[in-house]
Curated annotation (Swiss-Prot):
Record's function text: Part of the ABC transporter complex MetNIQ involved in methionine import. Responsible for energy coupling to the transport system.
Xref: CDD domains: ABC_MetN_methionine_transporter (cd03258)
Protein name per UniProt: Methionine import ATP-binding protein MetN 1
Stretches assigned to coiled coil: none
Membrane topology, record value: Peripheral membrane protein
UniProt subunit comment: The complex is composed of two ATP-binding proteins (MetN), two transmembrane proteins (MetI) and a solute-binding protein (MetQ).
Length: 341
């Protein structure tokens, strides 16, 4: 649906070249809710501006719904843009217009009939739960209600793609949760592909099925949300995951436990998925290795509706200790594990 092929973007500011994007490649599949996460200045917003051609790539290709738009003119982009809706952090509503007119604006600009406009706007306001607010003005609405108006406006043209640029950053946690639920409903009800730009890993965790992690203009990690949460490969991905899920004990706790430890030991970090959470893993390991297993840390969370568990286990070692059977057990049970040294 959206594909970036070795995309780079360079800006010239005060005779200085700034590389906003460097060799970015990934694909957003049809019906995905795809998250792009990174800190400020990572290149996220530049990336999304390439999709609706507010910026043009310096190198590489941007493919949208089968069209290579990299070198499209504004005229050539008109039909493509009809299939792309967008919502922003600060809503971008017309304060002088009612809720109804804000939502209707794209149809008014497209010179649709009054009958068609009334029918379509009414449908969208009902969908976002604001039918009773149609005659009010933006200043009379809460932040969450303003974003619902923006979502209705983005959907009124029946787009195939919805771009969300930090759409929940200005909202409180409860309102953020309600907006994410609405966006998930948008995806499921209309089959709209959503690309989420955010710096909040909780947004990725709660709504996205796939994610790209960006740092300094580059995509440093991609995968399903479950893959990235279960085994983040890069330091930045690990840092983002740790903001919403504690996946291992603190350094100070490990240091204290190591100081108190008598004899040699081996530690394992394991990731247990929903189908295995109720299994007697610790009991199995005790029987396999014939010794006690210490649980130094355990944390359960929910990712995409699935319960997962992170554990840090410790085995006391002696001359008879053999980790072959333990490793084999983890592999047979499809439990992701890592030996900690």
């Amino acid at each position: 649906m959206i594909e970036f092929r070795q995309v780079s973007k360079t800006f010239n500011k005060k005779k200085q070249k700034i590389d906003a994007l460097k060799d970015v490649s990934f694909t957003v599949n049809r019906n995905d809710i795809f998250g792009v996460i990174g800190y400020s200045g990572a290149g996220k917003s530049t990336l999304v501006r390439l999709v609706n051609h507010l910026e043009a790539a310096s190198n590489g290709q941007v493919i949208v719904d089968g069209h290579d738009i990299t070198n499209y003119s504004d005229k050539m982009m008109r039909d493509i843009k009809k299939d792309i809706g967008m919502i922003f952090q600060h809503f971008n509503l017309l304060n002088s217009a009612t809720v109804f007119k804000n939502v209707a604006m794209p149809l008014i600009l497209s010179k649709k009939s009054k009958t068609e406009i009334k029918q379509r706007v009414t449908e969208m306001l009902e969908f976002v739960g604001l039918s009773d607010k149609k005659d009010q003005f933006p200043e009379e609405l809460s932040g969450g209600q303003k974003q619902r108006v923006a979502i209705a406006r983005a959907l009124v043209t029946n787009p195939k793609i919805l771009l969300c640029d930090e759409a929940t950053s200005a909202l409180d946690p409860a309102t953020t949760a309600s907006i994410l639920t609405l966006l998930k409903n948008v995806n499921q009800t209309f089959g709209i592909t959503i690309m989420m730009i955010t710096h909040e890993m909780r947004v990725i965790k709660d709504i996205c099925n796939r994610v790209a992690v960006m740092e300094k203009g580059q995509v440093v990690e991609t995968g399903t949300v479950k893959e990235v949460f279960s085994h983040p490969k890069t330091t930045i991905a690990q840092n983002f995951v740790s903001t919403v899920i504690q996946t291992e004990p603190s350094t100070s706790l490990i240091r204290r436990l190591n100081d108190e430890q008598v004899g040699d030991f081996k530690d394992y970090k394991i990731f247990v998925e929903e189908t295995q959470v109720t299994q007697p893993i610790i009991n199995d390991l005790i029987q396999i290795c014939g010794r006690e297993v210490k649980i130094l840390f355990s944390s359960m969370s929910e990712i995409q509706g699935n319960t997962v568990c992170y554990m840090w286990l410790r085995f006391n070692m002696d001359q008879q200790f053999d980790d072959t059977a333990i490793n084999q057990y983890f592999k047979e049970k499809n439990i992701q594990f890592e030996e900690v040294h």
